[in-house]
Amino acid sequence: MLRYGQFCPVAKAAEIIADRWTPLIVRELCFGPCAFGDLLFAMPLISRTMLAQRLKEMADAEVISIVPKAQGRGNLYRLTPAGEDFRPIIEQMSAWGQRWTQSIAPEELDPVLLMFGARRQIDLAALPAGRTVIRFEFRGVPKAKAKQRYWWLVIQRPETEVCLKNPGFEVDAVVTADLATFTRLVLGYVGLREVLGRRLVAFSGSEAAIALLCRLLQLPQQPTQKTFRFSSGFAAAVAAPKRSAATARIAAVA
């Protein structure tokens, strides 16, 4: 942990929150307790050694607590009250980033982050009765992630499910899109009117299913600064997807 050698509260807080990877760890824990593997999955560029070091530092600073899993081996990491107080900081960082850092480099495109990130912004209370299945077909996927071109979003109470393999349900609508464009659309950097007009994104299938998707993902008609939620009351209460069997299958082909 970097020390600034000052009693200034800004310096003291920065010693804890401003280290590399720490804000992203806090971001994930804002959605609920995570296992070590969950955090690795959410941040594929972090090494196991670095993650272990950051978690130890955060525990020493009493920003997180470490508790054994109720079932199975391993621990869960969760925010303490001190860590919870970082939540509005993460929200403000998100708002600042949306306003001032809208460029996305090709190497930053990530279908996994896009799909699970979009999923966890869905308000579970807004899910309708019945099941709706949306298939996504992305163009412009980086070669290293070519196996992540096709996705299915299963919208059904009590929560939504993101699948990299066909779940076997009848598809109600299909989204065909350039990956970079759809990423910018989900972030609010571009609007539906523009991307549909330029045929960078196309919808087909049930109009009701398409309308539901646009509403749940809050896809804007015009560019707008969206408010992203960092709480466990939404579909990503498990943060960066929990390492379920489905998640393990995704990791296996990534």
Regions found by a protein language model. Give the residues of each.
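Glycine-centered, phosphate/nucleic-acid-interacting loop/turn motifs that mediate DNA/RNA or nucleotide
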Residues: E62
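Short, hydrophobic-biased segments on the C-terminal half of alpha helices
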Residues: L55-K56
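Basic, amphipathic "hinge/linker" alpha-helix immediately C-terminal to the N-terminal HTH DNA-binding motif
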Residues: A18, A70-Q92
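Low-complexity, glycine/alanine/valine/leucine- and proline-rich hydrophobic stretches
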Residues: R135-R193
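N-terminal helix-turn-helix DNA-binding core of bacterial DNA-binding proteins
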Residues: C8-I46
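C-terminal interaction segments
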Residues: G168-A254
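Amphipathic alpha-helical dimerization/coiled-coil segments
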Residues: P88-R135, E207, T224-R229, A235
